[in-house]
């Protein structure tokens, strides 16, 4: 993997990430395709309509169903899903904790039960890499020990030491495999305790292809989250991409870009779309509300997305009320277009050394009105 920094504006960074299946301009927002697809959308939607170059798939879900060996036999994730961009896959640790309800944490891995059939499974640092090799992920995440917030200091320290140990074991295992097209990212933990974040960085080896800031958006305040990012990002290698996991709102993303983060993922644009909330530059609207029943205008004037160029708010209001599946597709296309355009415009602003003024103008308009 090759990562080139093209511009730095204060702390905000613009770069190019060269992966086996695509070149990705950063900052980048990665749509979340848990089961190998973004809910209600297919590969054509992602490539030809949205122009997405990098999407996230979930190791835990692909391992349990259809099984990583099935995906491998069918040509890997890219051929299986017919998506010709790149895939980042997470380690599955978060889902093992959040979905199984019966997790046993051990020094060498995680024992969990499938949320599908109750069968027992064991994830180790090497096991999750083997799964991701079978998926042929462009970017693989290490197994880490997740902690919900708030958490006692002792638990945070235990988490970062275990996560660093697993990350370093993963790196050693990965080096033995000699698979240059499957890149490995470490995950920095430590909650909102800044000394714990520093210790996590210190304990994690420096030979990874990229570094993620994990363990945020799990119960802390926005101010605590931003303080943690501001402290952690400068500690990471400057020549490697920085990934903020599972965040978030447009405000969160722009704030994190200003603090030096390059990569983001979140279910928010698609989940909100399915629940009638649509993003516009003037704030969010709830398309199920009665005033949109006769509104013949697009979701947003001057929006170039597939839905806005063709359909009215009244039509989307009708589709949502009628529970038509087409609603989820059109709404998701709009919200993902909004997010992808936002980070694209943020990148252009960084290249032109005007990011802070772009961010200020964007957020002033975004907060001006929500319906």
Swiss-Prot record:
Residue span of region RNA binding: 246-252, 270-274
Catalytic activity annotation: 7-aminomethyl-7-carbaguanine + guanosine(34) in tRNA = 7-aminomethyl-7-carbaguanosine(34) in tRNA + guanine
Keyword entries, A-Z: Glycosyltransferase, Metal-binding, Queuosine biosynthesis, Transferase, tRNA processing, Zinc
Binding-site list for Zn(2+): 303, 305, 308, 334
Keyword Transferase applies: yes
Cofactor(s) it depends on: Zn(2+)
Biochemical pathway: tRNA modification; tRNA-queuosine biosynthesis
Residue numbers annotated as active site: 90, 265
A single GO BP: tRNA-guanine transglycosylation
Sites where the protein binds substrate: 90-94, 144, 189, 215
Tree of life domain: Bacteria
Cofactor note: Binds 1 zinc ion per subunit.
Gene Ontology cellular-component terms listed: cytosol
Entry EC number(s): 2.4.2.29
Name of one Pfam family that matches: TGT
One example GO MF annotation: metal ion binding
Binding partners and assembly: Homodimer. Within each dimer, one monomer is responsible for RNA recognition and catalysis, while the other monomer binds to the replacement base PreQ1.
NCBIfam families: Q_tRNA_tgt (TIGR00430), tgt_general (TIGR00449)
Chain's role: Catalyzes the base-exchange of a guanine (G) residue with the queuine precursor 7-aminomethyl-7-deazaguanine (PreQ1) at position 34 (anticodon wobble position) in tRNAs with GU(N) anticodons (tRNA-Asp, -Asn, -His and -Tyr). Catalysis occurs through a double-displacement mechanism. The nucleophile active site attacks the C1' of nucleotide 34 to detach the guanine base from the RNA, forming a covalent enzyme-RNA intermediate. The proton acceptor active site deprotonates the incoming PreQ1, allowing a nucleophilic attack on the C1' of the ribose to form the product.
The family this protein is said to belong to: Belongs to the queuine tRNA-ribosyltransferase family.
Protein name, entry field: Queuine tRNA-ribosyltransferase
The organism of origin for this protein: Helicobacter pylori (strain G27)
